[in-house]
Structure formats: structure tokens, C-alpha cells
Amino acid sequence: MPRVFLVRSRRPQPPNWSHLPDQLRGDAYVPDCSSLAVPPAHRSSGLRDTWAVSSQGTLTSAPKGPGTLGCPLCPKAFPLQRMLTRHLKCHSPARRHVCHYCGKGFHDAFDLKRHMRTHTGIRPFRCGACGKAFTQRCSLEAHLAKVHGQPASYAYRERREKLHVCEDCGFTSSRPDAYAQHRTLHRTT
């Protein structure tokens, strides 16, 4: 089987989603609740609140603790807006990011990128103690705790070290200078 590598490249033009209905097009679909009754106490409070649709079809304030954002479609709550936005994609039937090897669809580009590692064999998270490599950071952290008895104490930059992959032969390097030097070998041959 030929080796295949995930390479970032620009599309000739952005995809056109105009043929899809609105609820399938947006990053996060929140249904139009303008026809539902908003409780009078919340109309003029000036507070931004999170709403959920009750079984009777009326808006109710979603359960949340201090500093959390509730999903308007299910009981889950999140501490950050970006986490809520990502979660809202799971309620949409549209899966824009499709694996061209197996056809599996994903709501998020990051999930597709992580999935592609199963096809490419790229394992960017390496254990410093034994050298074993993993496709996901959480797998490395679990390995460190279970096998080496180390709690995960990596700095963000160490965890997210970029792996440079040659699309021609599969050469990998974490150092951009080594990757650039390798690429010159392909240009000379």
C-alpha cells in the first residue's frame, strides 16, 4: 500500500455551501427561538443568558454554574465560548470534513486531522523516557502516568511540537531546518 501523507495546501477556491439549508451551513446552528415566549423577568434584565427549549416549547434558562455557558439544545455546559461553539457542531447533521480514504465524516477540521493519523501512521507525540510515539497527546499523557508514573507536566509548546513531513518520501523531522535541508535533496534529483 502506498504511503500517504496529510499536507496542508490551499484550495483553488473556497467550497460553496449555498445549496445547503441554513441549519446545515453555519459553524454552529442555533434554532430560531423568536417565536417562543421569553420570560418577562429576562426581557429587560440586560443580562446575556443561555436558553434551552423545554418540553412544552417555551424558553427556559439552561442550567449553569458561575462562568459556564449552557448548550441551548442539550443540558451540557462549558466554561469557554469556543468549547460551546465546537460542541454545537455535534447537533448538526452536516459533516463537512470527510476522510477521502474511508469516507468517515467529521464536524471539525481538527477531528479529521487527528483521524488522518490512523491512515498516515504519523505519531507526533513521543515519550521522552522510552521513545514510544502516539497519535494523540492524551494517549502520551496516559502512557506517562501508567508506565512511567509521571504526571503530565509538559509546557504547551512541548506538547504541540510541529512535525514536518515530506510529501514525496515520508521523511519526518521536528526541526524546520532539517526538513528544509531534506527538501533540497528532492530539488537536485
Swiss-Prot record:
The record lists the organism as Mus musculus (Mouse)
What are the boundaries of the region Disordered?
A: 1-20
Q: Gene for this protein?
A: Ovol3
Recorded hits in PANTHER family, A to Z, give: TRANSCRIPTION FACTOR OVO-LIKE PROTEIN 3-RELATED, ZINC FINGER PROTEIN WITH KRAB AND SCAN DOMAINS
What is the similarity comment for this entry? Belongs to the krueppel C2H2-type zinc-finger protein family.
Any idea which UniProt keywords this protein has? Metal-binding, Nucleus, Repeat, Zinc, Zinc-finger
Localisation per UniProt entry: Nucleus
SMART domains hit by this protein: ZnF_C2H2 (SM00355)
One GO cellular component term: nucleus
Q: Which GO terms describe its molecular function?
A: zinc ion binding
Q: Which Pfam families does the record cross-reference, listed alphabetically?
A: zf-H2C2_2 (PF13465)
Q: What is the lineage of its organism?
A: Eukaryota, Metazoa, Chordata, Craniata, Vertebrata
- What name does this protein carry? Putative transcription factor ovo-like protein 3
Q: Which parts of the sequence are C2H2-type zinc fingers?
A: 69-91, 97-119, 125-148, 164-186
Q: What does this protein do?
A: May act as a transcription regulator.
